[in-house]
Every structure is written in structure tokens, then in C-alpha cells.
Amino acid sequence: MWIGIISLFPEMFRAITDYGVTGRAVKNGLLSIQSWSPRDFTHDRHRIVDDRPYGGGPGMLMMVQPLRDAIHAAKAAAGEGAKVIYLSPQGRKLDQAGVSELATNQKLILVCGRYEGIDERVIQTEIDEEWSIGDYVLSGGELPAMTLIDSVSRFIPGVLGHEASATEDSFAEGLLDCPHYTRPEVLEGMEVPPVLLSGNHAEIRRWRLKQSLGRTWLRRPELLENLALTEEQARLLAEFKTEHAQQQHKHDGMA
């Protein structure tokens, strides 16, 4: 996968290119990241990249000419078929389904805004899609862009060590992840669930699915509203609810 970055702070993306899963993907040639700074496309000696908004008000906008020229340079480098994305609080909220959808693209250009944003006409003429990582304000689009790159790159064949890792990730099936355990078997009196030590892969799979369903029901119940549960999932969720109620009753009795 090829990803182009439009950012006033391209050095921030060393966190993606030099470290972790994405760093290995870049090193192994599975992920290619190039960046363009609008500051390199300015025509004045001060390399100004912000401008006042029409109508007044606080803050500045990114200057149109350097930004557009940077986008055009990225498009030229990408060639045909690159989707241009603007990271914006007004965009579609990124979720696992969206990540999976974006991962089908071989080329992405990510535009990172700064200041109060960018001219609406640039969005209309240069941007294919707007995406948001949540309903809150950040200082720029770099962190959302890195979030998008990290999540999308997990779907690139060969990036993850285990072929099933991406499909078994939290949210991959619309559910939260199940609890995980490693050594020691007993930590401050708390034991690893015996089923995970049993070697019975069918029972382990069943336990993990039940815990995933239950954790989603407890923490993010709205996610279940969008799912059509299978017969097995519905049965396991009912079991979890019964067990949870029994545990709560026992806890209340001890209080």
C-alpha cells in the first residue's frame, strides 16, 4: 500500500515509519509512505502557510495555494487511483468497518489540516472523502492520520505476524475483545481461567466468544444493536448474562 501525507509537520510520521508494526511494514516494503509539506510550496521568503478567514473571527486557515500545490504534487506522485482523504471532525467517524473499507485502496493521500481548517473550496475540488476519529478537537490532522494508517495497515497481507490477527482484532466482528492472560498462572491470588489452560481449542474458542459478547454488552451495548447475532452468539450472551447476575448477587451478599 502507498500512502501520501500532506502535513506541515511531516516529521511527526516517524512514529509510523520507524516503530512497531507499521515500521516493520515500511522496512519490509509492504507499506510506502511519502510526505509533502505545504511550506515547501510557498512563494514568499517567510514561507507563510496560514491566512485570515473571510468574515473575521478567531484563528486562521491554511493558505489555499501552498496546500493545493502540495496536494497536486502528491496526486502526481501517486498516479491514477489515489483516494484523497481530509481528516476532519466533520467527517465520517472511523470504525472497524470503515477501516476495512479503506484498506481495499492501494493508494491513499491523507490531508492533515491545521489552524481552524482549510478552505471549503479545497474540500470541494480536491478531497474525495472526509474522515474523523471522534467527536473532539485536536490541534491538527496528524494524529488522526497516524491512527488511520496504523489501523488500515493491519489489513495489508504480511504485515501482521499471524494471518488471523486482523480478523480476530477487537471490533473485527463488531464486538469488543475478550480478556487475555499470560504468565504467571496466579497473580496476587487471581488465577487464569482454567479453560485457557485446558488445551481444548473448541472450549477456548467458545469461552472467548462468550467473554467478547459479554464485555460488549457491559461496556458498549449499543454495538450489539447493529449486529444480527447467530444462534450460538445469542445463547452464549444469555449464558454470560445469567452468570454475571449470579456473580453480582453473590457480591452484593458479601457486601
UniProtKB/Swiss-Prot annotation:
It is found in: Cytoplasm. It catalyses: guanosine(37) in tRNA + S-adenosyl-L-methionine = N(1)-methylguanosine(37) in tRNA + S-adenosyl-L-homocysteine + H(+). S-adenosyl-L-methionine binds at G113, I133, G134, D135, Y136, V137, L138. Gene3D superfamilies: 3.40.1280.10, tRNA(m1g37)methyltransferase, domain 2 (1.10.1270.20). CDD domains: TrmD-like (cd18080). Its main location: cytoplasm. Keywords: Cytoplasm, Methyltransferase, S-adenosyl-L-methionine, Transferase, tRNA processing. The keyword Isomerase does not apply. GO terms for molecular function: tRNA (guanine(37)-N1)-methyltransferase activity. Belongs to the RNA methyltransferase TrmD family. Specifically methylates guanosine-37 in various tRNAs. This is tRNA (guanine-N(1)-)-methyltransferase. It comes from Escherichia coli O81 (strain ED1a). The gene is trmD.
